[in-house]
Amino acid sequence: MTELHPDEQHVFLQCLNKMQKELDLSFERYERLFKTTQELQEKVKFSSSRFYNKDSTYSKDQGLAKESAALELQKLKQENVLLRKDLNNLEQISDCYAKGMDDIMKHVATYTATMNERMNACHKEYIKMYEALASERNSLYKINEQNVQSLNKVKEWLLKSLEEEP
């Protein structure tokens, strides 16, 4: 996956959030539709058994009520099919976004590991430089001590020579 800038990652996360909300809303609509469909199926069954008279004929009003319920049930079934398609599409989109998110997480993990390796290498170099500087300092300190001792000897020698020859 190509590297994403923080702005692109933010937009990607917003899209993922939006798609999740749409998926949730679609699922809620599907549940409501399923419940309504079941209720209407029960009404159709109830009305057909209730309004069925001894002569096997329906009165005009009873037949219209059954037709109306059956028509509404058919419309709900069609809407149910569309909602299922929407749900499948949203699930596919959600899966794609989840895969994209996984790719981003892998990229971030790889980037973090690479940066940690670089930081460790830099830290080791810093330690080496620090140790070299400390060694140089100690060496210079010893040379300085020797020079101070030499200067003190010269000073003593000069003081003695001044005392001996006024």
UniProtKB/Swiss-Prot annotation:
Gene Ontology CC terms: cytosol; FAR/SIN/STRIPAK complex; mitotic spindle pole body; nucleus; old mitotic spindle pole body
Subcellular localization(s) per the UniProt record: Cytoplasm; Nucleus
Organism of origin: Schizosaccharomyces pombe (strain 972 / ATCC 24843)
Keyword Mitochondrion among UniProt keywords: no
Protein name per Swiss-Prot or TrEMBL: Uncharacterized protein C2C4.10c
Upper taxonomic lineage: Eukaryota, Fungi, Dikarya, Ascomycota, Taphrinomycotina
Keyword Nucleus among record annotations: yes
Domain of life of the organism encoding this protein: Eukaryota
GO biological process per UniProt: asymmetric protein localization to old mitotic spindle pole body; negative regulation of septation initiation signaling
Subcellular location, principal: cytoplasm
Keywords, ordered alphabetically: Cytoplasm, Nucleus
